[in-house]
From Swiss-Prot:
Enzyme class: ligase
Protein name, entry field: ATP-dependent dethiobiotin synthetase BioD
Species assigned in the record: Bacillus cereus (strain G9842)
Family recorded in the similarity comment: Belongs to the dethiobiotin synthetase family.
GO CC aspect terms: cytosol
Annotated pathway: Cofactor biosynthesis; biotin biosynthesis; biotin from 7,8-diaminononanoate: step 1/2
The protein's role, per its UniProt record: Catalyzes a mechanistically unusual reaction, the ATP-dependent insertion of CO2 between the N7 and N8 nitrogen atoms of 7,8-diaminopelargonic acid (DAPA, also called 7,8-diammoniononanoate) to form a ureido ring.
A GO molecular-function descriptor: magnesium ion binding
GO annotation, biological process: biotin biosynthetic process
Length: 242
């Protein structure tokens, strides 16, 4: 298996922008990568304001929104609760099997979870259980501001305790006027967790274009470090890297 599992310290931190941007940059570099968000609550998959639609636009994948996100519900609750209230049951095996189907089309997949690792996800699993099934290296997306050191270090410790590899952290929503504090938080996260912060993605105010996001990802995220993970995974699997 090749790719990344994108998780976060909380909801509304910037996972979708980060996942879509990194996937879009990798596709521009010639990698055959896809995006996958198994469950989405808050919007149905076809809603242009939803995560599946944003992933499609930013990544530039040919797959449709309902293929990127096969299970979606409009109510903005934790996925397990939202599905239960709608009378729907989704099991861990279903979303894992779908992942394996997508791998027939793509060499690598960037998988976005929901909220953080302990979020109730399918009927029988938390987000972290799904991450353990895939065994992809994690990218942890976190806020750059007050409180982020605690949240990020706890997320990394929880992931490591479950045997998962954390490729790095990306602080999303960095404002120029706060960069001194952001840099201090970056250094503290690295010191306390032993995991590198691979990017300080700027805050996007108002409407933004795909081009703006991808250019920012190229400038502010260490894409070459992420490339090393993809290439190493592909070499272990005996598969081509592009």
């Amino acid at each position: 298996m090749s790719g990344f599992f994108i998780t976060a310290t909380d909801t509304e931190v910037g996972k979708t922008v980060v996942a879509g941007a990194i996937a879009g940059v990798f596709r521009e570099l010639g990698y055959n990568v896809g995006v996958y968000k198994p469950l989405q609550s808050g919007h149905v998959a076809s809603n242009p304001e939803g995560d599946a639609a944003r992933l499609k636009v930013l990544s530039g994948v040919p797959t449709q929104e309902n293929e990127i996100c096969p299970y979606s519900i409009e109510e903005p609750l934790a996925p397990r609760l939202a599905m239960k209230r709608a009378g729907r049951v989704v099991k861990l095996k279903e979303i894992t099997d779908y992942y394996n189907e997508l791998l027939k089309e793509f060499n690598s997949l960037f998988v976005e979870g929901a909220g953080g690792l302990a979020v109730p996800y399918t009927e029988d699993a938390l987000v972290i259980d799904f991450a353990k099934e895939l065994q992809l290296p994690l990218i942890v997306v976190a806020r750059p501001t007050l409180g982020t050191v605690n949240h990020t270090v706890l997320t990394i410790a929880y992931a490591k305790a479950h045997g998962l590899t954390v490729a790095g952290v990306i602080l999303s929503g960095c404002k120029e006027c706060e960069m001194e504090r952001v840099q201090e938080n970056k250094e503290m996260i690295e010191e306390l967790s032993g995991v590198p912060v691979l990017g300080l993605l700027p805050f996007f105010e108002g409407e933004f274009t795909k081009e703006e996001v991808l250019e920012s990802a190229k400038e502010y995220i260490m894409i070459s470090k992420l490339e090393e993970f993809i290439q190493n995974e592909s070499n272990v699997a005996g598969a081509p890297s592009i």
